[in-house]
Amino acid sequence: MSRTLVLVRHGQSEWNLKNLFTGWRDPGLTEQGHAEAKAAGQRLKAAGLKFDIAYTSALSRAQVTCQHILDQLGQSDLKTIRDQALNERDYGDLSGLNKDDARAKWGEEQVHIWRRSYDVPPPGGESLKDTGARVWPYYLHTVQPHVLRGETVLVAAHGNSLRALIMALDGLTPEQILKQELNTGVPVVYRLNADSTVASKEILEA
């Protein structure tokens, strides 16, 4: 049985390039971002993977990444579920701000705490812990059952929503997950055991 879960962070967005806090705002992909998403599809194709179902967020940068991947695999019409449970962490009042401007307004130390602490949210926004509190139950109830049935499942989402998933899958502490970087457009391939524990993990770097 396959029992394969593939996580892909969306390709570079226009706001990644401009150094802006994005969160639930909805900028498109850059030219590089489109290329990263297509390259992710090519790497998955080279690995011999085909999907049974795909999941993505309610935000276009993840949806377009998902579609590019499926197009590269010749699976353009695959059933794809879109749900805001997989959305990026909501940065609240920081959304749309340049990160340097935010540091000037609130101070470098405070912005660093908001960005890199596990359970301190920015004003009006979510912490990584809050993000995990919506992502992990969605995974357990909606995504994982497909994987455990032996299917190969794609989740195309965002840096922090995927970090919340990886934290739970890998059994990481808050301190460990905060040090983990997730590059845009790089597939992370998990194979699960029948009891839902991780049998193997592979990162398909370029």
Curated annotation (Swiss-Prot):
Species this chain originates from: Brucella anthropi (strain ATCC 49188 / DSM 6882 / CCUG 24695 / JCM 21032 / LMG 3331 / NBRC 15819 / NCTC 12168 / Alc 37)
Record-linked Gene3D superfamilies: Phosphoglycerate mutase-like
Keyword Isomerase in annotation: yes
UniProt-annotated catalytic positions: 10, 88
GO biological process terms on file: gluconeogenesis; glycolytic process
The keyword RNA-binding is annotated on this UniProt entry: no
CDD domains linked to this entry: HP_PGM_like
InterPro entries linked: His_Pase_superF_clade-1 (IPR013078), His_PPase_superfam (IPR029033), PG/BPGM_mutase_AS (IPR001345), Phosphogly_mut1 (IPR005952)
Lineage per the UniProt record: Bacteria, Pseudomonadati, Pseudomonadota, Alphaproteobacteria, Hyphomicrobiales
Enzyme class, first EC level, given as a word: isomerase
Protein name as catalogued: 2,3-bisphosphoglycerate-dependent phosphoglycerate mutase
NCBIfam families linked to this entry: pgm_1, PRK01295.1
GO terms of molecular function: phosphoglycerate mutase activity
Keywords from the named record: Gluconeogenesis, Glycolysis, Isomerase
Subunit structure comment from the entry: Homodimer.
EC number per UniProt: 5.4.2.11
Pathway named in the protein's UniProt entry: Carbohydrate degradation; glycolysis; pyruvate from D-glyceraldehyde 3-phosphate: step 3/5
Pfam families reported in the protein's UniProt record: His_Phos_1
SMART domains: PGAM
Reactions it catalyzes: (2R)-2-phosphoglycerate = (2R)-3-phosphoglycerate
Family, per entry: Belongs to the phosphoglycerate mutase family. BPG-dependent PGAM subfamily.
Chain sites annotated for binding substrate: 9-16, 22-23, 61, 88-91, 99, 115-116, 159-160
